[in-house]
Amino acid sequence: MAQFNSTWAISGRRSAISVDTFHALSIQAPGLLLGTLLFYLFYKYTTRIYFHPLSGIPGPRLAAATHLYEAYYNILRQGLSKRAVQLHKAYNSPVIRLGTNRVHVGDPSYYHTIYNSGTDYHKDPGVYKLLGIDGSILTITDPEEHKQYRSIVGSLFSRKTADDLAPMMAALLNRSTESMARQGREGKPSVIQRIYRSVAADMVSYLLFNRPLGLIDSPQEADHYHSFMLSIDRFTAITWPRFYYPILNWVIDSFPAFVVERLQPGLRNLQELFKGWLDESIAAHDAGKPVESRSTYFDLMIEAKRKTGEPLRPDQLFDDILNYLVAGMEATSYVLSFGTYFLLNSPEAKAKLEAELLEASPFIREKFDHRRIMALPYLTAVVKECLRLSNTVPGFLPRVVPKGGVDIGGYHIPGGTQISMIHPVVELNEEIFPNPHEFIPERWLGDNGQDLEKWAIAFSKGRRQCIGKNLAYMMLYASIAVVFSRLEMELYETTAADMEIIDQFAPIIQGVVKVKITKDRWRE
C-alpha cells in the first residue's frame, strides 16, 4: 500500500507538472507565434532591402520590401507612374527600384531595346494574369501563342478593314455632330467625351461584328451616357484593388445576378446580345452558309476552334470582346477629348486646322474620303501631338529581363527582373520634345517631324504594339476633321483640373470635357 501511495504521489506530481507546463505554454503561445512572425518578417524584408540582387539600385526601401508601396500609389494616389517620374529626379538615377523584383528605366534611349520588334523582353506572366481577362490578347504573354492568336484575328484589324469601315464612321459622325448642333440650338452643353465614346464603341462593334451596338441612336443617349458606359466606369474604378487583391474577382463573380445587374447595368444585356450573335454564327456555320461580306470575330473564332478541336468558350470570348470594346472606346475617346481641349485652348492652332479643313471640305463634307483626310499635313501634326500629350499609356507595360541580364546606367539588372518604362519618360522628355507640356503641332512638320517619328510611341512598338492601330488612326483623323470643320464651339465648365490623368491601368481623366456649340457651319 505504501508503495502504491508513493507511486500515486509521483504520478500526481507529474500530472501537475504537465498541466502547469501546458498552461504556461498556452499563455506563451501567442507571444511565441507573434515573435516568430516578426522574426520572419524582419528576415524577409531585411533580405529584400539589403541582400537582394537589386539591393544596389536606388529607390524607396518600402518599395523594395513590400508591394504595399505600389498598391498605395496606384489605388489611392492616381497611379505609381507619377511617383516614378519624381523618384528618378529625387535619386538622380536612370534606374530606380519600384518593387521587390521590379525596376523602372528613365532613360528614353532604352525604350526601343525593351519594346522593339524581335525583343527578348517578353510580357511578365505574373502581372498580366492578375488582370483576370482569360484568353484575351492583352493577357497572352507567350510570343508564339500571341503570334497564333494574331494570325486568327489579324484580318479584322487590317488597313483594308479600316478603309472599308470609313463610310460607317462618316455616318456616325454626321449623326453625332447633328445631335451636338441640336443641343447647341437648345442652349445646352454637350459632354463631347461621352459622344466620342459612343461613336468609338459603335465603330469597334462594326469592326468585330459588322453591326453597331447602337449607342449613338439609343434612347439612353439623351445625355450621352449609356448604361454600358456606367458599367465600364464602375469596372475600371476597381481595377487596381482587383489587381492587388485577386480574391475580389472571386467575390464579384459570386454575386447573384440581380446584384451584378444593379452594380453593372448594361453589361448583362451586352452579354445576352453577344450570346445571340454567337448563336447566329454557330447556326450559320453548322448549316454551311457562306459568310456574308467579311468574316466577323465570331466567324474567325469558330473556324479556328473547329480546326484545332478545342471547345468554344463563350465566357472567354466575352472577356476578349470586352477588352477590345473598352480599349477601342476608352483610348480613342480619351485622345479625342484631350485633342478637343487642347485645340479650344490654342486659338492659333485651331485657326490653322480650321483653315486646312475648309479647303478640304469637298472630301470631308461632300464626299467623305478618309485617305485624303489622313494626308492633310496640319491635321496629321495635330493628331500626333494629341497622341503625345494625352499619354495613352500612363502605366508600366512590364516586361521580363532576358537571361544574362542587362547593364543600364552603371547598374546590372539580372535576368528575370521585371522591367518597365512609362511613356511620359519619352513623350515628355525635354531633349526630345522642347517645351514638352505645350501643345505645339508644328513640331511634327517638316524635317524635324521626320526625326521625331521614332518617338511616336502612343501605340507602343514591336510585335506587341496596339492591334487596333489602323482603326484608331482612322477614327482620330475622321473625328477631328468632321467635328472641327462643322462645329464652332467653346469649352464649357472644363478646366485643367478636369484633365488630370489618372492611371487605372488604362488612362482616364479626373472630370469630363464639355463644350458649348455656338455655330453649325454646315447649316449656314
Swiss-Prot record:
The chain crosses the membrane at residues 22-42. It is an enzyme of class 1 (oxidoreductase). Its EC number is 1.-.-.-. Pfam families: p450. InterPro entries: Cyt_P450, Cyt_P450_CS, Cyt_P450_E_grp-I, Cyt_P450_sf, Cytochrome_P450_monoxygenase. One of its GO terms (cellular component) is membrane. GO terms for biological process: small molecule biosynthetic process. GO terms for molecular function: heme binding; iron ion binding; monooxygenase activity; oxidoreductase activity, acting on paired donors, with incorporation or reduction of molecular oxygen. Pathway: Alkaloid biosynthesis. It catalyses: cyclo(L-arginyl-tyrosyl) + reduced [NADPH--hemoprotein reductase] + O2 = cyclo(L-arginyl-L-dehydrotyrosyl) + oxidized [NADPH--hemoprotein reductase] + 2 H2O + H(+). Heme binds at residue 466. It is found in: Membrane. Its cofactor is heme. It is a single-pass membrane protein. Keywords: Heme, Iron, Membrane, Metal-binding, Monooxygenase, Oxidoreductase, Transmembrane, Transmembrane helix. Cytochrome P450 monooxygenase; part of the ank cluster that mediates the biosynthesis of NK13650 C, a highly modified cyclo-arginine-tyrosine dipeptide. AnkB is responsible for desaturation of the ankA product cyclo-Arg-Tyr diketopiperazine, likely through hydroxylation of the benzylic position followed by dehydration to yield a dehydro-cyclodipeptide. Within the pathway, the cyclodipeptide synthase ankA acts as the scaffold-generating enzyme and is responsible for formation of the cyclo-Arg-Tyr diketopiperazine (cRY) from L-Arg and L-Tyr. Belongs to the cytochrome P450 family. This is Cytochrome P450 monooxygenase ankB. It comes from Aspergillus thermomutatus. The lineage of its organism: Eukaryota, Fungi, Dikarya, Ascomycota, Pezizomycotina. The gene is ankB.
